[in-house]
C-alpha cells in the first residue's frame, strides 16, 4: 500500500511522500515558550491553535496517521537569484525590489489543495473513511510531521530541509484513518556547525538555532503584519518587498541540491515590475485584485504592498 501511495503521489507532482504517526508533539514546551516570548507578534491564530498543534491526534476525529507530502516551488528563474538588491533593472539601472520565490506564481494553498484533494480521494478508494487534506491552513505542525515521516530535518533556519533537494518545498498533509505504517522519523541533524542562516539574516530574526522571532522576520513584516514596518527594521529589508529568501538562499543544502520545480503553477509570471518603486502606488484596487487575486500577494492587500514596496525601495537607497 505504501509504495502504491508513493507512486500515486509522485504522479501528482509531489517530490516526496511519507507517513507520520499522530502522537503528541515533542515541541509543545518550546511552542509555549515561543508564544510567551512574544515571538509570534500579531499572529493571534497561533495562540488559538496551540493546543491542537501540540496534540495532532485531536485535529481530525478518527484519524490515525498523517500522509505528509512535499511540493517543490523553486521557479526556474529563482535558481540563479542571489541576495536581495543585487540585480539591476535593465531599463532604469535601479537595483530591483525582491519578491520571495514561492510568491511568483499561483497561490500555493490553491495549487496544493487541488493535488491533496486527489490524493484524499485515492485514499478513500482504498478503504479510508477519513481523509482530510490540509495545505498550510490549519493547526497542523507540518514540519514536525514531515520530520516524523522521514522526509527531512528541521534546520537552524526553522525550515524543513530535505537531503535530496534542500528547503524550497511546501508541506501538505492528509489526515486519514487508513492503516498505514509510519515511515520512521529523520532524527539526524545535518546542519552541523554551519550558522550561515543566522549570520545572513539582516534583521537578526533567527535569535538562536531553530528559534525565529517573527516580529523581526522580513517575511512576517511584509506579509502577516498589518502594522507599519518599524523604522529600526525598515532600513534592513535589503530590497525585499514581499517575503524573504535569504536564510534559504545561503543554505549549503540549497546551493548544492536545489533544482527548479517542474510544476507550471509555481513559475514566475512576471506580474510584478520589480524595477518600478511606484508600481503598486499607481495601481487601483480593482486592478490589484484582477492581477494578484490568485497569488500570495493578495494576503497583505494593495495597502500592504504599497507599504512594502515603499519601504523596500528606501532600503535600497545609498546611505
Residue ranges and their predicted role:
Residues 251, 255, 259-286:
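Conserved Radical SAM active-site core
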Amino acid at each position: 500500500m505504501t509504495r502504491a501511495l508513493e507512486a500515486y503521489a509522485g504522479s501528482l507532482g509531489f517530490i516526496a511522500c511519507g507517513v507520520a504517526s499522530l502522537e503528541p508533539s515533542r515541541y509543545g514546551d518550546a511552542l509555549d515558550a515561543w508564544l510567551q516570548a512574544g515571538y509570534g507578534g500579531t499572529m493571534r491564530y497561533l495562540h488559538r491553535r496551540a493546543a491542537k498543534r501540540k496534540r495532532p491526534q485531536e485535529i481530525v476525529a478518527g484519524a490515525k496517521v498523517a500522509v505528509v507530502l512535499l511540493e517543490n516551488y523553486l521557479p526556474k528563474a529563482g535558481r540563479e537569484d542571489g541576495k536581495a538588491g543585487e540585480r539591476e533593472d535593465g531599463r532604469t539601472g535601479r537595483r530591483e525590489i525582491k519578491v520571495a520565490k514561492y510568491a511568483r506564481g499561483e497561490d500555493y494553498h490553491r495549487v496544493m489543495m487541488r493535488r491533496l484533494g486527489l490524493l484524499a480521494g485515492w485514499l478513500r478508494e482504498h478503504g479510508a473513511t477519513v481523509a482530510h487534506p490540509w495545505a498550510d491552513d490549519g493547526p497542523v505542525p507540518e514540519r514536525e510531521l514531515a520530520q516524523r515521516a522521514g522526509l527531512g530535518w528541521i534546520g537552524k533556519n526553522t525550515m524543513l530541509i530535505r537531503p535530496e533537494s534542500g528547503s524550497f518545498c511546501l508541506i501538505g498533509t492528509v489526515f486519514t484513518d487508513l492503516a498505514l505504517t509510519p515511515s520512521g522519523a529523520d532524527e539526524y541533524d545535518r546542519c552541523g556547525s554551519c550558522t550561515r542562516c543566522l549570520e545572513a539574516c539582516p534583521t537578526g530574526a533567527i535569535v538562536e538555532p531553530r528559534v525565529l522571532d517573527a516580529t523581526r522576520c522580513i517575511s512576517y513584516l511584509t506579509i502577516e503584519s498589518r502594522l507599519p514596518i518599524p523604522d529600526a527594521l525598515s532600513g534592513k529589508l535589503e530590497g525585499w518587498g514581499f517575503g524573504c529568501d535569504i536564510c534559504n538562499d545561503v543554505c549549503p543544502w540549497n546551493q548544492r541540491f536545489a533544482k527548479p520545480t517542474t510544476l507550471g503553477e509555481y513559475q514566475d509570471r512576471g506580474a510584478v515590475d520589480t524595477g518600478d518603486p511606484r508600481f503598486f502606488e499607481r495601481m487601483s484596487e480593482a486592478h490589484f485584485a484582477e492581477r494578484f487575486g490568485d497569488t500570495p500577494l493578495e494576503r497583505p492587500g494593495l495597502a500592504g504592498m504599497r507599504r512594502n514596496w515603499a519601504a523596500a525601495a528606501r532600503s535600497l537607497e545609498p546611505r
